[in-house]
From Swiss-Prot:
It comes from Shewanella woodyi (strain ATCC 51908 / MS32). The gene is katG. There is a cross-link at Y224-M250 (Tryptophyl-tyrosyl-methioninium (Tyr-Met) (with W-102)). GO terms for molecular function: catalase activity; heme binding; metal ion binding. It holds the Pfam family peroxidase. This is Catalase-peroxidase.
Length: 736
């Protein structure tokens, strides 16, 4: 025994030493040595090199050929085919799959559009190993035979969302609809999920308890809120505040919140048969290689079935956990609820009467019965006056409740899919919903080359400057977010509230520009017998005309691509509050930065470039071009390193790298810098941190040097136009 102990100790010591050696021999990033260095990694994510599919693979085309009904039938078979390695509660995987789909979509947040069902990110670290996603690794493995069968014709992202719908339908619920179109990612998203370094901790609130920055979940590793209550405090009213804040930051109003919680908790059960600290192993990301991606191995009892331990809460909410009913609401309002503890020690709630002790069937043993349970977050629905009123109205009107849940579920799973033009399949609802940011369908012939040339001439003769036209086109198109495909030039919402009031868009000057463009549009459309042009198209065309003028003045003849076909949205089609989150608190391309920004100016530039799906060279070319065109939001000369503003040249890079200029911070200013002639001491330029980072950051300086070379001016113009066009058509899913 003594020898075995010694041997075990030696082996353990060797393993620890080996692990430490391997860790020490791993390459270290620049951020390891210099944590404050600007990180360009977000602009390199999701490279084509990560994607194993052929470059000519068209997912939309493959999906449209798919027999969706056959896929649904295959999913339906899986639902009631319980597997020994992970037995189904109540003989039905439906509730399990609903949780999987919900948690895949539920990471979405409105403030930056990140998270959500798109990409199938639940397959990757860190999401697949979040505490709130405990045991969902098994749900995806149950679906693997279906994914394997249909291959690339249906993405994991679409399959997960579809499975949630099929699960609901199999349990008697009528869903609102389904759309495919979510292409899979092949690597994890790089997302700021919070400042914490440990799961289930909360360092993300201000002094008033509000979440900071773009965050929506209340703790690291949770999808929404702590079901026990804020920081484990089982106070229903405090929980209601967290629920409203968290779900609200995920685009849900009070009615949708109540419908989702009540509807979701109509099905299935929570799992807390054992104490996690005593029974449950590490999450998938930390599990041994032989586990093959499985995590949370349970060493107590059978490890699954009746011994399953997930959240630590235990029990079902309703008497029929695999059927759609109003029983959740009936139980919530019929009983008085008192606190108790699950077998795992988590605080939950049960009725205060013994008459409820045997209402709920056991998930695996037909001879056992239980009392229904509620989380603190369920009791919050009853205790919060506004939530309660909605829940009571649902209880009185089951049809209203069912439709509300159906619509909220559809919104949850489709919020990050983008405009309806991206929706695929034959189950897309006909109703157009305002949260889909609707734009009228094209209903007229578009302008031809001759019309375009004439309109360009009219625009340039209107008295609008290059700066006016470039800034307006940029303001319109750069509202786009590649995270959830919202915003962009299509719809001309730059002409509507709230975008026409945003400080970054210089509202007074914007109104003057749009007024002149409106007149040009109306004049053309009145005279034209067939072709029409929208304001959305004319704004983009104005930017193209201005850039071509600036290119010509630089001595080149490059043309800016333009594809008509945009339409104009109305104010009625625009949810002002919903669009409010698209407002830029910083836009380094226009040298704009406000105190409301949660990152430094340079970091905000990277974030903006990431939202616009730009690469590092594209971002660099655009910043250099915008400075040459003197396109600062406030009309200032910061970063306009040229003697010929308005001419598209590489002067920004040439003068930034000029060694005859010495830079220093402007006295009494943390946000501005001054560039002086080293010999004369004369002030030559002023700059922001965004301008100077292209000379201080080694990677950005390398690209700046490329564009500053004597033979690179035409290449710079070509690259600027290509990057500009990319931004202008980011939202043109009709031509992609």
């Amino acid at each position: 025994m003594f020898k075995k102990t010694i041997l075990s100790f030696v082996i353990s010591a060797v393993m620890v030493t080996a692990a430490s050696a391997v860790e020490n021999e791993q390459p270290k990033s620049n951020q390891f040595w210099w944590p404050n260095q600007l990180d360009l990694t977000p602009l390199r994510n999701h490279s084509d090199e990560s994607n194993p599919q052929n470059s000519n693979f068209d997912y939309a085309e493959a999906f449209e050929k798919l027999d969706l009904e056959a896929v649904k039938k295959d999913i339906d078979k899986v639902l009631t085919n319980s597997q020994d390695w992970w037995p189904a509660d109540y003989g039905h995987y439906g509730p399990f799959f609903i949780r999987m789909a919900w948690h895949a979509a539920g990471t979405y947040r409105t403030h930056d559009g990140r998270g959500g069902a798109g990409g199938g990110q639940q397959r990757f670290d860190p999401l697949n190993s979040w505490p709130d996603n405990v045991n969902l690794d098994k749900a995806r493995r149950l679906l693997w035979p279906i994914k394997q069968k249909y291959g690339q014709s249906i993405s994991w992202a679409d399959l997960i969302a579809l499975t949630g719908n099929v699960a609901l339908e199999s349990m008697g619920f009528k869903t609102y609809g389904y759309a495919g179109g979510r292409e899979d990612d092949w690597e994890p998203d790089l997302v700021y999920w919070g400042p914490e370094s440990k799961f289930l901790t909360d360092e993300r609130r201000d002094k008033k308890g509000k979440l900071k920055g773009p965050l929506a979940a209340v703790e690291m590793g949770l999808i929404y809120v702590n079901p026990v209550g804020p920081h484990g405090n089982p106070d229903p009213l405090l929980a209601a505040n967290d629920i409203r804040m968290s779900f609200g930051r995920m685009a849900m109003n009070d009615e949708e919140i109540v419908a989702l919680i009540a509807g979701g908790h109509t099905f299935g059960k929570a799992h807390g048969a054992k104490k996690p600290t005593e029974c449950v192993g590490p999450e998938p990301a930390a599990a041994a290689v032989e586990e093959q991606g499985f995590g949370w191995k349970n060493r107590c009892g059978t490890g699954s079935g009746a011994d399953t331990t997930s959240s630590g809460l235990e029990g079902a909410w309703t008497i029929t956990p695999t059927q759609w009913t109003t029983n959740y609401l009936d139980n919530l309002f019929t009983f008085n609820w008192v606190k108790t503890k699950s077998p795992a020690g988590a605080i939950q709630w049960i009725p205060d009467t013994d008459t409820a002790a045997n209402l709920v069937p056991d998930a695996h043993d037909p001879t056992k019965r239980h009392a229904p349970i509620m989380f603190t977050t369920d009791i919050a629905i009853k205790e919060d006056p506004k939530f309660r009123a909605i829940a009571e109205s649902f209880r009185k009107s089951p049809d209203k409740y069912e439709l509300a849940f159906a619509k909220a579920w559809f919104k949850l799973n489709h919020r990050d899919l983008g405009p309806r033009s991206r929706y695929l399949g034959n189950e897309v609802p006909k109703e157009v919903l305002v949260w889909q940011d609707p734009i009228p369908e094209l209903n007229h012939p578009v302008v031809n080359d001759a019309d375009i040339a004439k309109l360009k001439s009219e625009i340039l003769k209107s008295g609008l400057s290059v700066q006016d036209l470039v800034l307006t086109a940029w303001a319109s198109a750069s509202s786009y977010r590649g995270t959830d495909m919202r915003g962009g030039a299509n719809g001309a919402r730059i002409n509507l509230s709230p975008q026409n009031e945003w400080q970054v868009n210089n509202p007074k000057q914007l109104a003057k520009v749009l007024n002149k463009l409106e007149k040009i549009k109306d004049k053309f459309n009145k005279k034209s017998k067939k072709a029409k042009i929208s304001l959305a198209d004319l704004i983009v065309l104005g930017g193209a005309a201005a850039i071509e003028k600036s290119v010509k003045e630089a001595g080149f003849n490059n043309k800016v691509p333009f594809t008509p076909g945009r339409m104009d949205a109305s104010q009625a089609m625009t949810d002002v509050a919903s669009f409010g989150v698209l407002e830029s608190t910083a836009d380094g391309f226009r040298n704009y930065y406000s105190d409301e920004s949660n990152l430094s100016p340079a970091q905000m530039l990277i974030d903006k470039a990431d939202l616009l799906t730009l690469t590092v060279p594209e971002m660099t070319a655009l910043v250099g071009g915008m400075r040459a065109l003197s396109a600062n939001a406030d009309g200032s000369n910061h970063g306009v390193f040229t003697d010929q503003p308005g001419v598209l040249s590489n002067d920004f890079f040439v003068n930034l790298l000029d060694m005859s200029v010495k830079w220093s911070k402007k006295p009494k200013s943390e946000a501005l810098y001054e560039g002086y002639d080293r010999k004369t001491g004369k002030l030559k330029w002023t700059a922001t941190p965004v301008d100077l980072v292209f000379g201080s950051n080694t990677e950005l300086r390398a690209i700046s040097e490329f564009y500053a070379s004597k033979n690179a001016e035409e290449q710079f113009i070509t690259d600027f136009i290509a990057a500009w066009h990319k931004v202008m058509v980011n939202d043109r899913f009709d031509i992609k």
